[in-house]
Each structure stands twice: as structure tokens, then as C-alpha cells.
Amino acid sequence: MEQTEVMKPETLEDLIKTLHQIFQSDSINVEEVQNLMESYQSNPQDWMKFAKFDQYRYTRNLVDEGNGKFNLMILCWGEGHGSSIHDHTDSHCFLKLLQGQLKETLFDWPDRKLQSGMKPRGQSVLQENQCAYINDSLGLHRVENVSHTEPAVSLHLYSPPFQSCRTFDQRTGHHNTVKMTFWSKYGERTPYELSVSQENN
């Protein structure tokens, strides 16, 4: 698979332009996208206008719709905020840390026959500027800001975009399908009824 000749992005805007070039292709080179996102050095001046926090839960803030090929968003995690265990609806998911630390816990898909709880398969702590990747063939994950003193900010790319996902109960393995919404779009708060969701990851 051919790789686009890319320069290291100096700004978030540069990164977005290069992502648009890469996603003109019908196929996706996971390593290329991950390397590109990792090569961007986080600069709060680039992304602060998109970083909208909520006191009670983490937020999803849309940055770019990627001509329908991908969604790029910034997630803001207050102290102790975390996601449910969830899938990614057959999409590629790239997660780059812009500020703070996030703990990612991986899980295998639950065995429907056993009706048993879900045991963590592995954990890692993402540091600033690191990038992680997951898709449904690799399993499920939960993301948490375990700090009680520092917020965290992460940049997520989903391709193709999706509007719902499945969240899982760790004790039973049962799942629910939930609709996801944006707390803000392009730096502007979305109407309240459009931004409330059961699970906003």
C-alpha cells in the first residue's frame, strides 16, 4: 500500500490538511496515520478553542468531519472521568494524548455462552504525544483519566465516522447500543438536547 509523502505537521491545522490528503484514498494505512498523529507535537494554542470540559463527565468535541471519511475530535477528561467498556462499530480508532495521562484497559469480546464477567487483558498508560490504535478485531477498551488532580485532553480520529456504539457491563458482559453526540462542534457548544448521550465516547 502506497504511503503519502508527508512532512511533520507543525500545527493541528497542518495535521488536519495532511489527514485530508491521506484519506482521499479508499484504503487506509494504519501505520501511516498513527505515525502522522504521533509526529504532531501537542501545542495547546492549536487546540484550546476545541477543549470544552464538563464538570461531571468527559466531553466529545468535533474538530473536523473529514469529508465524510473520518471524524476528528478532542475529548476532554476531568479528574477521575472515564468511558465505559466499548466497541468501535467496525471503525478504525486512533487516540493521541495532547495533555495529561490516560489509562487504556483492553478487553476481549465477552463469550455469550459463558455469561461471565469481563477480565482485563492488558493496561497501558498513555503519555503526552503518544498515540494508540484499536479496532473491533483487536477487542474492546475502556479509557480513564485516573488522576485526581490533573485533567487530560486527547485527540481521536474515527474512520469511517459512526454515530453509535455498544457499551459493555464488565460484571456480566451484557451490552447496550448507545447513541453518541458532541458536546461542541468546531469550538461552539451544541444545543443541550443534542449533546446529552448515555455514553459519549
Swiss-Prot record:
Q: How is it modified after translation?
A: The thioether cross-link between Cys-93 and Tyr-158 plays a structural role through stabilizing the Fe(2+) ion, and prevents the production of highly damaging free hydroxyl radicals by holding the oxygen radical via hydroxyl hydrogen.
Summarize where Fe cation binds, as residue positions. Answer: H86, H88, H141
- Cross-linked residues, 3'-(S-cysteinyl)-tyrosine (Cys-Tyr): C93-Y158
| Main function | Catalyzes the oxidation of cysteine to cysteine sulfinic acid with addition of molecular dioxygen.
Q: Keywords, A to Z? A: Dioxygenase, Iron, Metal-binding, Oxidoreductase, Thioether bond
What are the recorded GO MF terms, alphabetically? cysteine dioxygenase activity; ferrous iron binding; nickel cation binding; zinc ion binding
Give the pathway annotation. Answer: Organosulfur biosynthesis; taurine biosynthesis; hypotaurine from L-cysteine: step 1/2
The EC number of this protein is 1.13.11.20
Cofactor: how and how many bound: Binds 1 Fe cation per subunit. Ni(2+) and Zn(2+) can be used to a lesser extent.
Q: What class of enzyme is it?
A: oxidoreductase
* The keyword Metal-binding appears for this protein: yes
Highest taxon listed in the record's lineage: Eukaryota
Family, as annotated: Belongs to the cysteine dioxygenase family.
Q: Which cofactors, by name?
A: Fe cation; Ni(2+); Zn(2+)
Q: Which residues form a coiled coil?
A: none
Q: What is the protein name for this chain?
A: Cysteine dioxygenase type 1
On subunit structure and binding partners, the annotation says:
Monomer.
Q: Which reaction does it catalyse?
A: L-cysteine + O2 = 3-sulfino-L-alanine + H(+)
Instruction: Give me any GO biological process, just one.
Output: taurine biosynthetic process
